[in-house]
Amino acid sequence: MDLKFRCLIKNVADGRAGEIIVEECLEIIEQKYLRLMTIDLKEIRSSMFDQESNPWVYVFGKIYISGLMGRAIGKRMVKRGTYRIKEGELINHFEGVHIHFYKDIEKIFHSIRV
């Protein structure tokens, strides 16, 4: 099952550091579901802004979920929307991170018939 994600992380040194944090978040989510599914990272990109006062990184990309319960868990992730990874769970970052999962909006619009 193909999904997209987006994540806004503050107080990060650069875009690559944000990508590493998101990869760690995906690993934590995989562990929370007892490895009944695997998350394969297909594409990841980052964009940094407001570097002087309070650096923010916007990380987004695509993942593929497979495995024993991959489709069911993927649908649940989209339905839930946002996952919060707490401060103590992350090794590479000292603040909590919210990551949002969604399906391709283009497919949703094509399925609606008028």
Swiss-Prot record:
Superkingdom of the organism of origin: Viruses
Name under which the protein is recorded: Protein gamma
Organism, as annotated: Bovine ephemeral fever virus (strain BB7721)
